[in-house]
Amino acid sequence: MKIKEDKVMAVVKELFRGEQGGAVSFGDYTLNKKTKKEDIEFSGDLYKVKTFYEITKLEKNGAFVYESVPGTAVENFAVKEDGISFQVAGYRDCEITVELEESTQYVISFTGEQHGLMETNRSGKLSIGVELEEGKDVEVSIVKR
């Protein structure tokens, strides 16, 4: 799979980047082969990222945090007391799975518009479909109800 370089919005070429305030940015959906970076220290935690055009996955201290199929670029992924928020970009629509509190309801919003209420399963995972258009990012907000 070859992504057109002229249409790509910002990807995280270094695969993982810590941001001010504790947020993280990660992922490069333009890569043709699976690439990973492990044992990344940031704010007292250890991160691991795997990414390429088919999948992007983030782990924190050995635990699942984020996964998208196909791969994406994620900026300003911030975990807050009441949920998470981030910007995501990719070359086509994707399914994103995140780890949150188990059996809890969350309001899902894309670029400021509410798109419904979802409940995590007993393991705390929540999966959402995000419509992506190459060259444009989508702001995702998942807030506890």
Describe each region flagged by the PLM:
Residues T72-V79, I108, V140-I142:
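Generic structural motif
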Residues K2-A73:
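Catalytic cores of secreted or luminal carbohydrate-active enzymes
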Residues Q87-T104:
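Surface-exposed beta-strand/loop patches in extracellular or lumenal glycoproteins
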Residues K36-L58, Y66-S68, C94-I96, T120-R145:
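C-terminal beta-strand-rich structural cap/linker in extracellular carbohydrate-active enzymes
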Residues V74-N76, G83-F86, G116-M118, S127-E131:
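Beta-strand-rich interaction surfaces with strong enrichment in secreted/lumenal proteins
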Residues K80-G83, I96:
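Non-catalytic accessory regions flanking glycosidase/transglycosidase catalytic cores in CAZymes
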